[in-house]
Amino acid sequence: MPLRLDNASPDFASKFKAFLAMKREVAADIEAATRAIVDDVAHRGDAALLEATEKFDRLTLDAAGMRVGEAEVEAAVKACDSETVDALKLARDRIEFFHRRQLPKDDRFTDPLGVELGWRWSAIEAVGLYVPGGTAAYPSSVLMNAIPAKVAGVERVVMVVPSPGGTLNPLVLAAAQLAGATEIYRIGGAQAVAALAYGTATIAPVAKIVGPGNAYVAAAKRLVFGRVGIDMIAGPSEVVVVADKTANPDWIAADLLAQAEHDANAQSILITDSAVLAADVERALAAQLTTLPRVKIARASWDEFGAIIKVAKLEDAVPLANAIAAEHLEIMTADPEAFADKIRNAGAIFLGGHTPEAIGDYVGGSNHVLPTARSARFSSGLGVLDFMKRTSILKCGPEQLAVLGPAAMALGKAEGLDAHARSVGLRLNQR
């Protein structure tokens, strides 16, 4: 059964603290096994990559067979249902429109001393996109990861996707084509992450790796971080719905289940000031649950990690929502904008009853790659800036150096870095 909390209870603070500390993933000790795979690919390249693909994906390939050719992509697109492809095109266009507004501007200015300062933005040259295969194939995630990279100006977007038994999801390939992926390889797991980071004879290395994956993929991303950049280590998905008596309980129940059906470790939370609404949502959820194809997954998620939190007044929900720092925050109240203005920590906010999270997942335009497990306290969802770098620019003339140089020399000497002081002093004809 889901957890029930009431902030009127004397032990609420301790129970809420325990709730925040709840672990939704039991991480197996896989680092050693993952490190062995990563090190093997780093040292033996294609040979290790092909061996791991045969072992884990039951797929025998040669080096040339790893890359998915244009003809195969075209055939996959033709095999897709036209209505779904049209939906992907709509999603692509809206995601691109949203992310183009995130493009930053260069700047160059002169300060009162006459020093020229500024910054310049440039795209990362090559990015690897990991896409899960098999039953967890989500073409929408291809769009969400690849399109911001292309908008940023990334030249090489390299997609890797496992094909257990040799089968690739046609919609994933269609999404890759629509999003502008430049290379696609039928490899997955920790070995694919290693290939992207270190490169092989077949796959040139990238500078950053993004995209979700299983525990081995997450462990591999941790191991290669530093050699390449990574987006984030994503945990199970989560939603918080804040609602008052004006909300529709059937809609809330559907949204809670939409999160629960993702994964048995997903989390769905309702915070409300209405005991009547809470009871109505529970009844609606129980009725809807039995009609879902993924009923076992959704039930496990709701029973194990679901929660209904009753608050005395709606304002009490603000600190709770900020503490949870949910990946998705839906606000179904009489004045959702007013509530949202008080929220500091959330991956994405969905305002009003007609904005279900599912719209943001697919066709809203905003990105659905969002921080989980309370990391919205310090991080943001994926965007254009994740695929760009800012370089500072500084220019002094003789006059400016004469003004700033003595202070730089003093600080260099104070820090025991005499060569620093000398590099300025020589230009000032000082020793």
Swiss-Prot record:
Pfam families: Histidinol_dh. SUPFAM superfamilies: ALDH-like. Binds 1 zinc ion per subunit. Pathway: Amino-acid biosynthesis; L-histidine biosynthesis; L-histidine from 5-phospho-alpha-D-ribose 1-diphosphate: step 9/9. It comes from the Bacteria. GO terms for cellular component: cytosol. InterPro entries: Ald_DH/histidinol_DH (IPR016161), Histidinol_DH_CS (IPR001692), Histidinol_DH_monofunct (IPR022695), Hstdl_DH (IPR012131). NAD(+) binds at residues 130, 191, 214. The active site is at residues 327-328. Keywords: Amino-acid biosynthesis, Histidine biosynthesis, Metal-binding, NAD, Oxidoreductase, Zinc. GO terms for molecular function: histidinol dehydrogenase activity; NAD binding; zinc ion binding. It is an enzyme of class 1 (oxidoreductase). Its EC number is 1.1.1.23. Substrate binds at residues 237, 259, 262, 328, 361, 415, 420. One of its GO terms (biological process) is L-histidine biosynthetic process. It catalyses: L-histidinol + 2 NAD(+) + H2O = L-histidine + 2 NADH + 3 H(+). Zn(2+) binds at residues 259, 262, 361, 420. Its cofactor is Zn(2+). PROSITE patterns: HISOL_DEHYDROGENASE. Belongs to the histidinol dehydrogenase family. Catalyzes the sequential NAD-dependent oxidations of L-histidinol to L-histidinaldehyde and then to L-histidine. NCBIfam families: hisD. This is Histidinol dehydrogenase.
